Amino acid sequence: MPMPDFQVSEPFTLGIELEMQVVNPPGYDLSQDSSTLIDAVKNQITAGEVKHDITESMLELATDVCRDINQAAGQFSAMQKVVLQAAADHHLEICGGGTHPFQKWQRQEVCDNERYQRTLENFGYLIQQATVFGQHVHVGCASGDDAIYLLHGLSRFVPHFIALSAASPYMQGTDTRFASSRPNIFSAFPDNGPMPWVSNWQQFETLFRCLSYTKMIDSIKDLHWDIRPSPHFGTVEVRVMDTPLTLSHAVNMAGLIQATAHWLLTERPFKHQEKDYLLYKFNRFQACRYGLEGVITDPHTGDRRPLTEDTLRLLEKIAPSADKIGASSAIEALHRQVVSGLNEAQLMRDFVADGGSLIGLVKKHCEIWAGE
């Protein structure tokens, strides 16, 4: 399938997707009932969309194109109310978090969807193992070349995005010792990690054409890069975050990415080069393993910096951009989070260390999502 032309969109507009967990009380294992919920709510959603993801235990909430995080928050809040009522009607519950702490991948049912069934045929059990839950953020771009510049700029801050959203310390009933274990699930996919280097949109079109020769790629949606351009929407899509436990944190993460994009495309602070990616996977690993306590290394100078310190520096740099696009509240909230040292992964571990069970942990996450 040929790649569509890049559809120009209004710069810095926003779209957010949240992959939510559908769980079955009182055992709080993953349910296989997302289709039931989608059928129940499809005529009640007036803005945004509630839809399938890979398996029947995943429920995706997606906003329409939004001008700012306040509009996105309003759409999510309305969807959340409808979904929670439908879940209660069917004796189900909903929660965030990047992984379910004790589900077994062998039990997961792939959705009856042509694309997902084709993906199952290509990737086998890897697709069932990909029953993990992330937040994706789209940012509008005026051109394909702007999208490539923005993608490279945002890639510098992938460790920061992972660390701030880390919410997946448990998997398959085990403490993984990672703050964010979710990204590890995709390491076996041939397109895992950063997009191969291109310097402009024309080179990207050549790259996509080459990838299509493998017969495994029908569209951009079949590529699992950490950040990818989406020509159909005219956006760049950041895909590295765990789904947060609260709607407010999800909105704050979107505000961070929107403000960072505004700063990058307005100030053009970097002259991107392929060497920028030399230590990409090492820095990404530090964020996944240690969260904000990780240490990142500059591929050009060899300087090593604590992620906490570098994240505070980023928040300071983008504050003027955040003010211009209505995202200051997000930057202020994330600044408080970094200074306090609190993060969702550690809060989960604290709950278990205090005697809580993994079943109790999922129940608590459902209460948090419903109570906000």
Curated annotation (Swiss-Prot):
GO terms for biological process: modified amino acid biosynthetic process. HAMAP family: Glu_cys_ligase_2 (MF_01609). Keywords: ATP-binding, Ligase, Nucleotide-binding. The gene is ybdK. It catalyses: L-cysteine + L-glutamate + ATP = gamma-L-glutamyl-L-cysteine + ADP + phosphate + H(+). Its EC number is 6.3.2.2. Homodimer. Coiled coil: none annotated. Pfam families: GCS2. It comes from Escherichia fergusonii (strain ATCC 35469 / DSM 13698 / CCUG 18766 / IAM 14443 / JCM 21226 / LMG 7866 / NBRC 102419 / NCTC 12128 / CDC 0568-73). InterPro entries: GCL_type2/YbdK_subfam (IPR050141), GCS2 (IPR006336), Gln_synth/guanido_kin_cat_dom (IPR014746), YbdK (IPR011793). Signal peptide: none annotated. This is Putative glutamate--cysteine ligase 2. ATP-dependent carboxylate-amine ligase which exhibits weak glutamate--cysteine ligase activity. GO terms for molecular function: ATP binding; glutamate-cysteine ligase activity. Belongs to the glutamate--cysteine ligase type 2 family. YbdK subfamily.
